[in-house]
């Protein structure tokens, strides 16, 4: 589990860091004595230093994050890398998966575009967009999920663990 909302991270930065970073570290520490397994830790595409480039971020781009959510998730990336190199010794395959904005069933969180639109329509209220000029690449939640499962299967066979980006086609 994680604290998944940027705006919530401003309201509760300590809780965000405790949940996202220490929650992951506790999990990593628990599995370090396993004989073998394949783990995918899902972070976010917001782990990158935001340089406002005109291309999609690549896995080896600089990590950063100016808000508590993004920087805590970048720290999760570093924790996974540290445990991979310090404790796992190829017996535990662990990769990070960085996905962007997803839509799909089960997401009724506050301040999410699809649930907020549905709620506004049901209650005949005006939908308020936080950043109407923003353009975001959306993908259905099952698309990256399929990728995570495929990655977990492949990393068991190939013994390679890295960071991977999951996003929609650039169309």
Q: Predicted regions span which residues?
A:
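Conserved NAD(P)H cofactor-binding loop of Rossmann-fold oxidoreductase domains
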Residues: 1-4, 43-45
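Serine-hydrolase catalytic-loop signature spanning alpha/beta hydrolases and amidase-signature enzymes
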Residues: 5-9
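Glycine-rich Rossmann NAD(P)(H)-binding loop
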Residues: 99-106, 128-139, 161-171
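Catalytic helix-loop patch of NAD(P)-dependent Rossmann-fold dehydrogenases
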Residues: 11-29, 33, 37-38, 47-102, ...
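Alpha-helical substrate-binding/gating segment
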Residues: 115-127, 138-164
